[in-house]
């Protein structure tokens, strides 16, 4: 029982997205020999291997047959819709659902790079609360997502109701000032 719990905890640590610069995507150098853990005939070794993924070009994505393509698309859809950040779940999940079937291998690599970004940072960059780094802003998937988000934002929210560029959207409540320095319009 203790061995089983230890293996489950090791699996959770390896799969954790809290580890900076880590991903659960199998790296291109998959010909290395990794320890293989068998449980009821299921190979958990290289499948859950994590490695530093500073560049999206490190991924070995196999879209050669329909089964591999289906699995890859399903994983990407799941990762984009189940981030735990409601706004990103909706925006990113819908965009991926609309566009993932038409992506080639480079598009999938760019999408994986975007999916590996932290939620708060990605949201601030998509909504122009902060400037994204050059590596992110040059990503074609990020650019398309950013364009969609800004188009929807401009369509549904008047500019005077938004925070100034580079500023957080929500101003914290201050019991002493009681909102005297609040924006002229909007509920920020």
Swiss-Prot record:
Name-wise, this protein is: Succinate dehydrogenase assembly factor 2, mitochondrial
Family listed:
Belongs to the SDHAF2 family.
The entry's cellular-component GO terms read: mitochondrion
Q: Which Gene3D superfamilies match?
A: Flavinator of succinate dehydrogenase
Transit peptide, first to last residue?
Answer: 1-21
Q: Which UniProt keywords apply?
A: Chaperone, Mitochondrion, Transit peptide
Its ancestry begins with: Eukaryota, Viridiplantae, Streptophyta, Embryophyta, Tracheophyta
**A Pfam family that the UniProt record links to this protein:** Sdh5
**From which organism does this entry originate?**
Arabidopsis thaliana
UniProt note: phenotype after gene disruption: Inhibition of primary root elongation and early lateral root emergence.
Q: Where in the cell is it found?
A: Mitochondrion
Major site of localization recorded for this protein: mitochondrion
Its biological purpose is as follows:
Plays an essential role in the assembly of succinate dehydrogenase (SDH), an enzyme complex (also referred to as respiratory complex II) that is a component of both the tricarboxylic acid (TCA) cycle and the mitochondrial electron transport chain, and which couples the oxidation of succinate to fumarate with the reduction of ubiquinone (coenzyme Q) to ubiquinol. Required for flavinylation (covalent attachment of FAD) of the flavoprotein subunit of the SDH catalytic dimer.
């Amino acid at each position: 029982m203790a061995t089983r719990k230890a293996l489950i905890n090791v699996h959770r640590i390896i799969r954790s997205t809290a580890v900076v610069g880590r991903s659960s995507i199998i790296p291109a150098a998959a010909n290395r020999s990794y320890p293989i853990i068998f449980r009821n005939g299921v190979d958990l070794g290289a499948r859950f291997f994590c490695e530093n993924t500073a560049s999206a070009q490190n991924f070995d994505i196999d879209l050669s047959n329909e089964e591999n393509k289906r699995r890859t698309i399903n994983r990407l859809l799941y990762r984009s819709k189940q981030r735990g950040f409601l706004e990103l779940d909706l925006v990113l999940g819908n965009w991926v659902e609309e566009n993932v079937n038409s992506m080639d291998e480079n598009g999938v690599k760019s999408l994986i790079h975007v999916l590996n970004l932290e939620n708060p940072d990605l949201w601030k960059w998509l909504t122009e609360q902060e400037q994204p780094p050059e590596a992110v802003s040059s990503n074609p998937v990020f650019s398309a997502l950013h364009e969609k988000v800004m188009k929807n934002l401009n369509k549904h929210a008047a500019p005077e109701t938004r925070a100034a560029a580079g500023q957080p959207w929500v101003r914290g409540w201050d019991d002493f000032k009681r909102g005297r320095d609040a924006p002229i319009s909007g509920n920020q």
